[in-house]
Amino acid sequence: MSFVESWRSVGPRRRRQVTPGPVTRSVYSDYTQGNSWSEDGDEGCDQVARDLRAEFSARASSESKRAPLLPRIGDGSPVLPDKRNGIFPATAAKRTQARRWPIQALSILCSLLFAVLLAFLLAIAYLIVKELHTENSKNEDVVDTGLLGFWSLLIISLTAGLSCCSFSWTVTYFDSFEPGMFPPTPLSPARFKKLTGHSFHMGYSMAILNGVVAALTVAWCLM
């Protein structure tokens, strides 16, 4: 009895395994007949396409809310910014500006302090020269006797010349792409000489010339 019962239980299992056979043949027959895409398949593809479109539209709307609006051309298409090495130039410019603004502020502050110091020194020199001019005396032979000696005149004129030269050189330094040399000389550095092709820098040469002219002018006025 046990053998017969086991044979009966195995029989339906075999039938269950054999039953999908005709279904597969019908499917293959449908493909051979050219009906590869049925109505159910079309509906499934349409559903997938709708889901993808909804996802893309949701992403586009979220990105448009987060990102600023791009300018558009005449046909309505947006103008995309240029991208170099994975970085947009606007982003790189903002980063460099954020890094350089402390240096620029410090340079402006140093320039203002230098200008104030120079103005203070020139004001003191003007007061000294004015006081010395009023103290000029005449002797009994009606000969003008100046209280300024040679060394005093030389020191005052050199101070005025160096102050004017330093101020001109500082202005040229901040306004030129060539950093120049220190102490200030009219010669350009070797690496910039290869780029520009000339060994003299006109800006620094004019700064030194301004100092010389200022020294000569002060000496001429005090003599």
From Swiss-Prot:
The chain crosses the membrane at residues 108-128, 142-162, 202-222. It is found in: Nucleus inner membrane. GO terms for cellular component: nuclear inner membrane. Disulfide bonds: none annotated. It comes from the Eukaryota. Keywords: Membrane, Nucleus, Phosphoprotein, Transmembrane, Transmembrane helix. Residues 1-44 are annotated as: Disordered. Belongs to the ARL6IP6 family. This is ADP-ribosylation factor-like protein 6-interacting protein 6. It comes from Rattus norvegicus (Rat). The gene is Arl6ip6.
